């Protein structure tokens, strides 16, 4: 991968020098890295949508970027020799060193909790899974937010690094590119090095945006992982290309800007929407005579063409905004079960799909949704504004000054800051209201960037209106003091992280194995052998289950262990459920714990439950498997041991062939006439997600004798949320019925109590040749009992 990244950077440098016409060598290098990386993501996505296999698509996209770079290298001499300014290099070196210290420390010191989705997504892309699905719900398509993972998978195709190491390389390289891009954006838009240094410093260390009573992010250096390196590489590259377009409207500049801007939608739709709207607004502003006088000939045409190209790329790329527009334009489309709505079940599914609903106006209006508890925070309230950095407070004055100076780049960044707060305060995003923290950080970052650009303009104005050196130096000192005060939070965070590193050196993880063990402590050589077997023998669209952490149903542990197994085996997992949310506030994960079927299977080893789960492989940790379940596995038809590790911890892989399982018995519908549930016993006094056997008393009236094997199962309805639980929380098995007229029979059923305390209704069903027949129901409640609370034993058989 490292060689591929270097070649990508060289190609990007050539394209910026020869096609965009950038002469400053460091500028061409940093913008080239960001543009080439972004171009690879966009091209790879478009090629895959033409149904080209993943590995072939990765080589084609990479080859196209290298080819464009080679063309640029051949044309570079036409714009003259490359220019290297020693002072710029020194300032960039100092800023890059500080950023590197924080970025690498944060990458090494601990795992990113958001990697629960990114690790397996990258792995599935490498397996060739496209279009992509949610790794935790293989039957659910995933909309949006995948560009970063797609690009990383494309580069990892060239080998030489694992997923975690690749993420570290990606974060460091792209953040360094953004250092250079922020610097040169400030220098070009703000008129000199004062703006360049101020903008870069504030963007990385002085944003200070968020909720003061929850979490405030100091800047890009603190959000070093997840999607952020790629998102802001796109963001600053687009702004720089916009600035270059204003200076010289070259076709290559307009095309590159349009491709990157349109592709941003599949990486981070929120940032695309805001940036695209701001650029469109400023393009309209150039039509105003007083503003348009400062625009070079041809800029309006080039800008319009670039924005039109961005819109087309957005529509065909499959990102969330493009999908919503296409769906809205398709008048023949009808609402489906996957369409987000106000029901609890659809709310749960929307989280797994990243499927966003948008309504206007938001109630209450002009409020932000707190990321922790979901409460409404008025946009202009002291509790919110008082928690933001100084850049947001200075934004109105900075915008007035930049408008007076006709600084179009500064106006764009200022509009991004304003829209990033107005949009989430005015529009309701349904399940994702709690995610408006992303908007808030973008607003704070854009405000910091705007103030940095404005500070350079102020300094240029002072320099042009006074000959006094002490006034100039006083202005520089004032700007430096303001930046330093805003960076204090970043350095406190750095010192705390450094204290953690020195106090707990075992948390400083560098190798790929150490990074995996940060999520899954027992991961070792036996796991590596088992995962390699699945990488070699697993196929696309096959699914996996594992019993990692079977003794600990904490959602975070189940999630982390599943993430590591999936990412190393490159197979999705069919073990989780769509959970109903009792409240709609804050940031909510779509993956919280095992489904009832998964818990019941690993407890009982029942082959009928396994059939309903439909995995293709079982990844078994024998030491956490009960003896009864281990024995049951060896007796299930269609389940065959395929691999056992020879080194390290014992790991066993089972192959599941559903076609080899015997047909499930069914009764005739007529034979169930007069059959009804008398009572369901054993539903009292248990805590959420606890397994037990319940007893169903079934009675029958009528002359027809009911006798034979049948599949009997239950479904649950959450009476508190007024919604059915997910199908994965329905459990059934095969039992033998033999009931005569007036008789009754007690059947035991595996049962897992629902995950939320509250009131429920259980309905009992029997499968027949003519469909499922409901034979009765019972209401019950689940209390939030503390772990270890004793509860009644199930009645004896």
Predicted regions and their residues:
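Alpha-helical transmembrane segments at the extracellular/periplasmic loop-to-helix junctions
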Residues: 1-11, 64-65, 94-97, 226-237, ...
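Membrane-embedded, hydrophobic transmembrane alpha-helices
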Residues: 1-84, 792-796
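Membrane-interface transmembrane helices that cradle and orient dolichyl/undecaprenyl
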Residues: 18, 234-253
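Membrane-interface helix-loop-helix junctions at transmembrane boundaries of multi-pass membrane enzymes
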Residues: 78-87, 247-252, 290-303, 397-419, ...
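Active-site lumenal/periplasmic loops and adjacent helix-entry segments of GT-C-fold
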Residues: 86-234, 269-273, 506-523, 544-553
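Membrane-interface alpha helices of multi-pass inner-membrane proteins
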Residues: 253-268, 280
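Signature aromatic-anchored transmembrane alpha helix within multi-pass, membrane-resident enzymes
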Residues: 280-282, 296-315, 458-500
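Extracytoplasmic
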Residues: 333-341, 403-407, 482-664
């Amino acid at each position: 991968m490292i060689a591929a990244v270097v070649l990508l950077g060289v190609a990007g440098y050539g394209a910026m020098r020869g096609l965009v016409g950038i002469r400053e060598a460091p500028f061409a290098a940093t913008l080239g890295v960001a543009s080439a990386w972004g171009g690879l993501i966009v091209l790879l996505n478009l090629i895959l949508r033409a149904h080209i296999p993943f590995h072939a698509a990765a080589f084609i996209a990479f080859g196209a970027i290298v080819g464009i770079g080679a063309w640029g290298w051949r044309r570079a001499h036409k714009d003259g020799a490359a220019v290297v300014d020693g002072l710029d290099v020194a300032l960039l070196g100092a800023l890059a060193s500080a950023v590197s210290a924080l970025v690498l420390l944060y990458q090494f010191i601990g795992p990113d909790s958001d990697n629960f989705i990114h690790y397996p997504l990258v792995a599935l892309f490498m397996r060739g899974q496209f279009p992509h699905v949610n790794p935790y719900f293989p039957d659910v398509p995933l909309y949006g937010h995948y560009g970063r993972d797609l690009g990383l998978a494309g580069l990892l195709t060239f080998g030489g690094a694992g997923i975690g190491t690749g993420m570290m390389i990606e974060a460091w390289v792209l953040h360094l590119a953004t250092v250079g891009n922020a610097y040169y954006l400030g220098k070009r838009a703000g008129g000199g090095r004062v703006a360049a240094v101020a903008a870069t410093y504030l963007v990385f260390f002085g944003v200070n945006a968020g909720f003061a009573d929850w979490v405030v992010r100091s800047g890009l250096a603190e959000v070093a992982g997840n999607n952020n390196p790629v998102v802001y590489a796109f963001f600053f590259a687009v702004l720089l290309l916009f600035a270059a377009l204003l200076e010289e409207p070259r076709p290559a500049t307009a095309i590159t800007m349009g491709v990157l801007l349109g592709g941003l939608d599949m990486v981070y739709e929120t940032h695309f929407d805001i940036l695209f709207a701001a650029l469109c607004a400023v393009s309209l502003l150039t039509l105003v005579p007083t503003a348009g006088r400062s625009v070079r000939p041809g800029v309006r045409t080039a800008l319009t063409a670039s924005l039109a190209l961005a819109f087309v790329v957005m529509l065909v790329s499959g990102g969330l905004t493009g999908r919503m527009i296409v769906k809205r334009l398709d008048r023949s489309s009808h609402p489906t079960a996957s369409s987000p709505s106000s029901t609890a079940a659809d709310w749960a599914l929307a989280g797994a799909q990243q499927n966003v609903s948008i309504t206007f106006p938001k109630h209450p209006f002009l409020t932000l949704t707190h990321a922790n508890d979901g409460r409404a925070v008025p946009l202009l309230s002291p509790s919110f504004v008082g928690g933001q950095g100084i850049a947001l407070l200075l934004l109105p004055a900075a915008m007035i000054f930049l408008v007076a100076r006709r600084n179009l780049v500064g106006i764009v960044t200022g509009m991004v800051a304003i829209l990033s707060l107005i949009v989430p305060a005015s529009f309701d995003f349904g399940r994702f209201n709690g995610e408006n923290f992303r908007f808030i950080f973008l607003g704070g970052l854009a405000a910091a960037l705007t103030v940095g650009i404005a500070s350079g303009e102020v300094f240029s104005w002072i320099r042009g209106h006074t000959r006094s050196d002490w006034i100039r130096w006083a202005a520089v000192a004032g700007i430096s003091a303001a930046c330093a005060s805003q960076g204090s939070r970043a350095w406190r965070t750095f010192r705390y992280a450094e204290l953690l590193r020195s106090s707990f050196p075992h948390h400083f993880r560098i190798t790929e194995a150490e990074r995996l063990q940060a999520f899954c402590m027992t991961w070792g050589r036996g796991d590596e052998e088992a995962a390699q077997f699945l990488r070699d023998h697993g196929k696309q669209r096959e699914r996996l289950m594992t019993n990692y952490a079977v003794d600990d149903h904490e959602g975070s542990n189940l999630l982390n262990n599943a993430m590591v197994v999936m990412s190393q085996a490159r197979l999705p997992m069919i073990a989780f459920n769509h959970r109903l949310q009792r409240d709609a506030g804050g940031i909510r994960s779509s993956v919280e714990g095992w489904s009832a079927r998964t818990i019941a299977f690993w407890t009982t080893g029942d082959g009928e439950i396994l059939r309903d789960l439909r995995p293709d492989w079982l990844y078994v940790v024998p030491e956490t498997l009960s003896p009864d379940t281990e024995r049951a596995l060896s007796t299930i038809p269609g389940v065959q041991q395929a691999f056992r590790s020879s080194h390290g911890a014992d790991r066993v892989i089972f192959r599941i062939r559903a076609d080899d399982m015997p047909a499930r018995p069914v009764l005739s519908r007529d034979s169930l006439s007069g059959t009804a549930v008398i009572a369901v016993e054993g539903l009292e006094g248990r805590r959420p997600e606890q397994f037990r056997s319940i007893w169903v008393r079934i009675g029958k009236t009528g002359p027809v004798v009911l006798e034979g094997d049948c599949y009997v199962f239950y479904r649950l309805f959450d009476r508190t949320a007024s919604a059915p639980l997910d199908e994965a929380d329905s459990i059934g098995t095969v039992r033998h019925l033999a009931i005569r007229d007036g008789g009754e029979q007690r059947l035991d059923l595996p049962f897992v109590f629902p995950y939320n305390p509250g009131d429920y209704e259980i309905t009992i069903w029997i499968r027949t040749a003519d469909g499922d027949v409901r034979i009765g129901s019972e209401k019950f409640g689940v209390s939030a009992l503390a772990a270890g609370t004793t509860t009644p034993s199930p009645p004896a058989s």
